[in-house]
Amino acid sequence: MRVKPQGLVVTSSAVCSSPDYLREPKYYPGGPPTPRPLLPTRPPASPPDKAFSTHTFSENPRPPPRRDPSSRRPPVLAKGDDLLPPRAARPVSQAHCPSPAPDNSSLRHWDNGRVNLRPVVQLIDIMKDLTRLSQDLQHSGVHLDCGGLRLSRPPAPPPGDLQYSFFSSPSLANSIRSPEERANPHTKSERPSHPLYEPEPEPRDSPQPGQGHGPGAAATATGLPPEPEPDGPDYSELADADILSELASLTCPEAQLLEAQALEPPSPQPEPQLLDPQPRFLDPQALEPLGEGLELPPLQPLADPLGLPSLTLQALDTLPDSLESQLLDPQALDPLPKLLDVPGRRLEPQQSLGHCQLAEPLRLDLCSPHGPPGPEGHPKYALRRTDRPKILCRRRKAGRGRKADSGPEGRLLPLPMPTGLAAALAEPPPLPPPPPPTLSGPGPVPELEPESSQTPMVPTRKGKCRGVRRMVVKMAKIPVSLGRRNKTTYKVSSLSSSLSVEGKELGLRVSSEPTPLLKMKNNGRNVVVVFPPGEMPIILKRKRGRPPKNLLLGPGKPKEPTVVAAEAATVTAATMAMPEVKKRRRRKQKLASPQPSYAADANDSKAEYSDVLAKLAFLNRQSQCAGRCSPPRCWTPSEPESVHQAPDTQSISQFLHRVQGFRRRGGKTGGFGGRGGGHAAKAARCSFSDFFEGIGKKKKVVAVAAPGLVGPGLTELGHPRKRGRGEVDAVTGKPKRKRRSRKNGTLFPEQVPSGPGFGEAGAEWVGDKGGGWAPHHGHPGGQAGRNCGFQGTEARAFASTGLESGASGRGSYYAGAPSGQTELSQERQNLFTGYFRSLLDSDDSSDLLDFALSASRPESRKASGTYAGPPSSALPAQRGLATFPSRGAKASPVAVGSSGAGADPSFQPVLPSRQTFPPGRATSYGITPATSDCRAAETFPKLAPPPSAVARSPTTHPPANTYPPQYGGYGAGQSVFASAKPFSGQDCANSKDCSFAYGSGNSLPASPSSAHSAGYAPPPTGGPCLPPSKASFFNSSEGGPFSGSAPTPLRCDSRASTVSPGGYMVPKGTTASAASVASSSSSSFQPSPENCRQFVGASQWPFRQGYGGLDWASEAFSQLYNPNFDCHGSEPNVILDISNYTPQKVKQQTAVSETFSESSSDSTQFSQPVGGGGFRRANSEASSSEGQSSLSSLEKLMMDWNEASSAPGYNWNQSVLFQSSSKPGRGRRKKVDLFEASHLGFSTSTSATASGYPSKRSTGPRQPRGGRGSGACSAKKERGGTAAKAKFIPKPQPVNPLFQDSPDLGLDYYSGDSSMSPLPSQSRAFGVGERDPCDFMGPYSMNPSTPSDGTFGQGFHCDSPSLGAAELDGKHFPPLAHPPTVFDAGLQKAYSPTCSPTLGFKEELRPPPSKLTACEPLKHGLQGASLSHAAQAHLSCRDLPLGQPHYDSPSCKGTAYWYPPGSAARSPPYEGKVGSGLLADFLGRTEAVCLSAPHLASPPATPKADKEPLEMARPPGPPRGPAAATAGYGCPLLSDLTLSPVPRDSLLPLQDTAYRYPGFMPQAHPGLGGGPKSGFLGPMAEPHPEDTFTVTSL
């Protein structure tokens, strides 16, 4: 028996188990211990350890504790019999061992918790008890054979039988018995449970080991030292069991509960059975039956006290038993038993609470492992023990055989019963009384069996157990797909889930084919986990080890089913996991959901890439790098859905989201394949959507509702086929999408409406785009409907609001059910609002935001593979950023949303770009669509004519119809507005729908949509559609409004009110009101504001676009505009959205009265064309500014979220900022570099593009991201020269540079500038000389460029300093501004207060410095951080109070003030400030700098540049004041963006104004990017303007 001391050695293992177990219970106790303690304790100590455990139990630990108990036990026995009260138990507990005593208390406390979780507790306990019983059986045999514990198990059969009835009857009795009732009987009951283990100890301790064991068991139950004796072995098992239990609990808490019950119930029969089992166990301890019986009462008292205090003695008994089971193994580690007793006990209670999970896994193990016969289990058990993962499965099975011998056959069979009471009924066959115990017995026995090699269990049990396990464990927690992302938690959680899902198949199969499981476990390093866990190890391993074995993949694939990998897993599983056909099939079943999402194509593709996809799916699932890898081939337009769906599935859980957050951040970091990235983005989005659980769910509803709409929309769009990737538009496509929606869980369904409604766009995208992206984007768009792609991103946050609103509204809007969609949008927005409020309000929000953002953005990033921008955009848009994506999508929708299809095409074009750099996705969403739309759409829209109609809208918008709708038909917005927009609106809304009109249809959708669609889609679409759009404001806003340029303002307003699309920003009160009005604004605004907005939006943007740079405005502006509006619309929406729900936002809103009561002003200003468009943005921004405190935190959170996927967020900002650039932003970051070269050399290109509107258009499409960023910037500067061109292009250029680098965000954003020195150069390319003040860039770069590049700052600063250039621009821009000012002046004036840029333009013409200064402190102080918003607010403020000076001042000073601090100082200022997020946005977006430091850039090209450029800008600023000053400092970013003063000013206002102004649009893009984008990114950038952006981006 000294081996028992050795057992103590095992104790180390057990101890590990114990701590692990402790840890395990915390989350998934089973997970960690399974690998570590379980493996060591169980596999190594499988037979010996058990023996050791048993011996240690009996001898070392047990004798001492036992002696204590023994000494006490006689009295306790006498007393205990009498004293069922906890006192007896407690004294024993305390007397036995202080540690256990405390544990007893702990246990009791936990038990109380457990009692609360009693059903689960019962399962858990029973499981544990069963395990313990199994161990007892094992130990009885083991005890006889210290070495051949398992082989000795045969003696266990009698005890097994006894235990069986013992468990059975008492199990039922315990289950039925009230805690107190059970307390009295269960004093014994508890004893029996322990006697179960006692038999183990009894054989170990011949003298009174029974009693000692009983006390040990009692102590264990009670937390007494005696427990350690059972605890040691049991704990080993328990560690194993705990891990298994964890898995089991995940899969089937019932089993454990039953097990606990079964184990507990034995109390009534314990003495007789104990005696009987004792003799059996007693082989050595046959004499101890009585001792055991005696033991029983004392132990029972212990248990009773535990149980009684525990509320449910049963639960407690079960718990103690469970603990004992758990601790039994650990008790093999004598010291550990006690330690374990304490921890174990605590864990056990935890298990009661958390062991549900543990117990479930335990159950799983118990159930699962039952399969193998005891004897078989013996060798296998040893193996399994070595291979802990398998151990449970096999061991249990082995245990079954032994149990059969022991007579726990019933138990083995009963395990299923724990799974279902039916098993208990089934148990009766073995014994009428034992049936419940049989049910529970099998659980414990299998559990113990794995430890003790419970071969005694009959194989019959094994089979049943196996089936039961499969049943109970497998399907239970499929949602754990989440866990996939969560590698650690995910391990247990996902494993359990996978096990649950796959466990049935796999479990069954594994039971049959344990070897593969074993392998898989070894591969998965989760060797510790038994097969049910085995699958988990595979998944875990696969997650952890990127390249899990294919074999593992089969089992591990189950996760994949959750993800796209699921489908791949289906194929791969089928291909690879042929052996595990069932598992595979199950996965396929699981894939059924995804598969619909997938087209058959996806499956085919996956089938083709079974191996690749298996791996890739795994990777995809994990990093979605695989998505990037795999999607190329696999990812057909239909595939992205599947990929996204997989993430959607994953996003089913926030865990996934969380994991995605860091996993995507990490694994997907770069968002390399637009595919994988888009994919990830979608998944993340979906996750994010799931993150917004309510949102997703509502979306689901919409999905259902939208489908009809979608069907129409789809049909309407004429991309029905693609939309429902499977040709069936509504039926197939929808179902697919719907399924995916389902998969998305909540998101997809809603997305489906959006997807379908939006799906028309999505499908359109998918179909029209037909490109990998289209599906992705379409699915991000259409799937935006799914909110996974877009809706997930935009509609996630926005999907709830805008996306669904926009997507639904758009899709529905076009589908003809805008109202319903609007409802949904509102609902969604409400959800979104609520969610965001939660995010903002709760620290959770940090995680959520981070996750959402991270997931969203990283996902965006990964979704955007190369460019998370759109995904990020989508993601940001998704939740708060949803606004951005909205913006992005809106820019996209404006550019793309306006041509949702266009956006889709943009996406699609961006798909290339997007795949190249999903920024296109953001762009696609926000900017790429515009850019991509312009450029990609131009490029791709051709590819996707329908979207082209839409996507081409921007591009085609040269066919202003769709394109203007994209930006409200910017100039055409008027005609395009009314005319093109209806078409465009349809297309746009549709496209927008597709694009989501992203901002349009997303949270902003209503807002931006309203602004955009309503602005210009609504006028035309709003006019025709917008009314409905108005009615369905979100639809209008999103669909129709989205089209409107005015809606962009509306969107801004909406954004500011954030709702407008959902009114959910209503909290914004004013803005909500205004935004709600934005809804109205979109609606109201659609009519009035719409007109206003049309004027503002259309005029602002269109005017600016049309007037300022009709041509470039049409295209480049559209892109800029879209991004502007998109960015701003989105961002404000995001910012405002969040702000809206944030009281601070309201507070700030008041503070930002200057912002025109962002909401009020937004809406009002929206209403007033002046305030309307520009102010909507200003409001939005201002609102953001206002809400900056709240928004700052919100945005900060969001930005952090984005920050989490900083690059993505930034990227999407990039995207938004430079739609095309945005596209390049991520994947194209190189492209950006390329374009950066362009940007650098874009002077040339920009000159051409900037000079020529066509060039600009080239830039506009910004294929030339450089073209846009460079071209935009350069063009802007050149356009500064060209006035109109410079006007637009500079912005795009900065946008491009800004957002080009945006992938870097900090870097890319600036890298676009900085990294893209070209940006500084190119951004300043047109004005590299102009931007010569690149030195300022250094300081400027210090802001956002600091990390990325002084150059960018320089470039930006250059732009700011560019004031010379900016002046040039201003000079040019004034002309440029003049067209814009024409409409900008009118528009700007119209929304001059709102449109600081307008005022900026006009006011810019005024002494911006004064304004700047005037507003600067205020702006800075008030909006300091909210510079963007402040700029917007100040834009508003400056517009309102000073107009330009106010604006400029804050901008200028803000720049110096914010900027000088540099990114950090500036970030802190705005960071600290309400504008911090915004400023960070501005800052974080170089555009932020530009915007924030539009004046900043100009004045604070450097902090000194602040003044110097400010001066420079001022002198030039005054002349160029409107453009240069504003652009210079008003929009240094814009200036930097080469946005020319106006763009610069517009940049800041652009957020509001530039973003609204076509002229500023150039800026607007950057400004928007800088402003709204910056605003949004600002927080992201703000946290790490450079770092995060740069880092995240990179």
From Swiss-Prot:
UniProt keyword Membrane present: no
Biased composition (Low complexity): 272-303, 1153-1168, 1180-1191, 1245-1264
Keyword set includes Repeat: yes
Residues with the Phosphoserine modification: 267, 593, 825, 842, 892, 1060, 1180, 1315, 1317, 1392, 1396, 1498, 1540
Omega-N-methylarginine, modified sites: 887
Modified residues (N6-acetyllysine): 79
Chain residue numbers at which the record places covalent cross-link Glycyl lysine isopeptide (Lys-Gly) (interchain with G-Cter in SUMO2): 606, 1402
Biased composition (Polar residues): 165-177
Pfam families, per the entry: DUF4683 (PF15735)
Basic residues composition bias: residue spans: 391-401, 734-743
Residue ranges for the DNA-binding region feature of this UniProt entry: 395-407, 541-553
Region (Disordered) location: 19-111, 149-241, 256-307, 367-464, 578-604, 714-789, 942-967, 1152-1191, 1245-1306, 1495-1525
Record note on disruption phenotype: Lethality; mice do not survive past birth. Mutant mice show developmental patterning defects affecting craniofacial structure, abdominal wall closure and epidermal stratification.
InterPro entries named in the record: AHDC1, DUF4683
Bias type Basic and acidic residues, positions: 178-193
Keyword entries, A-Z: Acetylation, Activator, Chromosome, Developmental protein, Differentiation, DNA-binding, Isopeptide bond, Methylation, Nucleus, Phosphoprotein, Repeat, Transcription, Transcription regulation, Ubl conjugation
Location in the cell: Nucleus; Chromosome
One term under GO cellular component: chromosome
Gene Ontology BP annotations: cell differentiation; mesoderm formation; skin morphogenesis
MF annotations from Gene Ontology: DNA-binding transcription factor activity; promoter-enhancer loop anchoring activity
Composition bias, Pro residues: 30-47, 427-447
Modified-residue entries (Phosphothreonine), positions: 1394
Known function: Transcription factor required for the proper patterning of the epidermis, which plays a key role in early epithelial morphogenesis. Directly binds promoter and enhancer regions and acts by maintaining local enhancer-promoter chromatin architecture. Interacts with many sequence-specific zinc-finger transcription factors and methyl-CpG-binding proteins to regulate the expression of mesoderm genes that wire surface ectoderm stratification.
Protein name (database record): Transcription factor Gibbin
Source species: Mus musculus (Mouse)
